[in-house]
Amino acid sequence: MDIKLWTRAYYQDLLERSENKRKKDLLELLADEKKYAPCFEGLDQLTESVFKRIFSKKYLGNTKTFEQEMQSHVISTAKKFCPDVEKEMDDTTVLQQLWIEEYAQELSLKGKLHFCLKEENGSTQEINTECYRFGTTLNSQTLEHAEIKEVQNIQKIVIFENKANYISAPYKDGILYLFSHGYFSPKECRFLKQLHQVLKNQTSCEVQYFHSGDLDYGGIKIFQYIRKTIFPELEPLQMDVETYEAYQEFTEVIDPETLEKLKRVQDENPKLQELIKRLIETGKGIEQECFLIEKRGNHI
């Protein structure tokens, strides 16, 4: 989205709050907010990712000012006003949605994917990840400059929330595995949206999309986010009552506050409704890594 939209909403809210304040309180509010102005102005100007300390030096005059004085306020504000940010995202993921990086954005994948990279001399290098049978990682620059080929041999995309499950997935022809590490970063999202469009244009076969994550509130929210922002055809994999019952001995207690959140999202997720109902009934969830202890229930 256009970052200016959410910062504009933030300042509009600030104006509305200031209208009903006494002069003394208003001056205190404006004094508190004034120090954040250069930071939000910098966020407003970003058109591509920048490392956190470089952003801080450029717009705030010191490499550590953002992290020490601005970061917590920016994150809480973004969670309130930025539609690309989910309340459940950790700090690093929120900053990535705002184009501020603590480290490079990378996409880990396993399977056959064809794309091209343009060299500095203008020539094009074709790449097929099929040879990396145990998986490979595309760095930030590759995600930015890769051009996905129009012809792909992908029948199924399977996303894993956790790395151990991604690594353990066996290479199979026609399946592209992705590791989401929670929420995909903006560069990963943009790359995967391009891939989705290419696959939609294919007439040879209809691609299936699956996501496998933790059987808890966080896993459900991640599934919902990926389905909303990247792959609208996404289906849950190993995120059902059958899988839950198969691994019930590995359940962990869900805190009361999170249980209340689960109740609020039950109607938002028809594909996960039965699982959510079971989580609420038992008050317990299961982490995806437990599926690797012993194969039970539904597996790839």
Show which residues each predicted segment covers.
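Nucleic-acid enzyme cleavage-core boundary/entry regions
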Residues: M1-F179, F184-Q197, Q202-T203, G218, ...
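Short hydrophobic alpha-helical runs that function as membrane-insertion/retention elements
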Residues: V158, L176-F179, Q208-F210, L234-Q238
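Arginine/glycine-rich "motif VI" loop of SF2 helicases in the C-terminal RecA-like domain
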Residues: Q197-S204, I230-P236
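Acidic beta-strand-to-loop metal/phosphate-binding motif
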Residues: E206-D216
